[in-house]
């Protein structure tokens, strides 16, 4: 494009922030979700992280990624507050997140995990034996989220609430392995491009979960 490195970084920051802010503004007009200052701060932190790495390292040693593991929701009946109607978490999930995989990949916060994938090789001394493609990733997720602030909703004029004892909202923290696809360096130019594009998705690999319920869970693939 003819832009200098600094101008390219600055332009990328502006475009990235504007693109991400669109979603936050749309949420701000929703009574169910509302504008989120932490979400906006996370957007700015992500863009800034990219810019700082590019400025100081001319490389992305820490990559932000996402994964989404499909969730099967309970079809057990939930009785309305008036006791005159029933629903289920399966029905609620269809309303909130959509019924097909692609909708749920984008919308289902219970299925999503957000990762910071660290390329260990790039932080060690030159000539180290750590595989250049093998990363350590830390992740953050949540469970039993069926509303913006609480698990209460309306359906055909009836009010429902998911029992917080049975379906507690809680946070999940992960540490696990990941693959930095561009570091594999395939010879095929087309494959190089594909690896670069899909590197925003974490590769399923063994991971350890620690959650705010006080549980430690090992996942063979996460």
Question: What do these predicted regions represent?
Answer:
Residues 1-222:
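Hydrophobic alpha-helical membrane segments
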């Amino acid at each position: 494009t003819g832009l200098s490195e600094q101008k390219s970084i600055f332009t990328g920051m502006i475009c990235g922030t504007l693109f991400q802010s669109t979603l936050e503004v749309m949420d701000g007009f929703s009574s169910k979700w509302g504008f989120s200052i932490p979400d906006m701060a996370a957007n700015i932190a992500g863009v800034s992280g990219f810019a700082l790495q590019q400025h100081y390292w001319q490389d992305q040693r820490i990559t932000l990624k996402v994964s989404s593991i499909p969730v099967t929701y309970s079809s057990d009946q939930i009785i309305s507050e008036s006791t005159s109607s029933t629903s289920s978490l399966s029905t609620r999930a269809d309303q909130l997140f959509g019924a097909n995989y692609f909708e749920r990949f984008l919308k289902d916060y219970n299925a999503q995990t957000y990762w910071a994938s660290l390329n260990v090789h790039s932080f060690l001394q030159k000539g180290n034996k750590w595989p250049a493609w093998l990363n350590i990733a830390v992740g953050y997720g949540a469970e039993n989220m069926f509303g913006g602030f609480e698990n209460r909703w309306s359906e055909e004029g009836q009010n429902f609430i998911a029992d917080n004892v049975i379906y507690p909202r809680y946070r999940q923290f992960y540490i696990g392995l990941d693959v930095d696809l561009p570091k594999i360096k395939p010879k095929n130019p087309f494959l190089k491009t594909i690896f670069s594009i899909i590197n925003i998705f974490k590769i399923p690999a063994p991971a350890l979960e620690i959650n705010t319920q006080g549980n430690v869970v090992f996942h063979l693939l996460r």
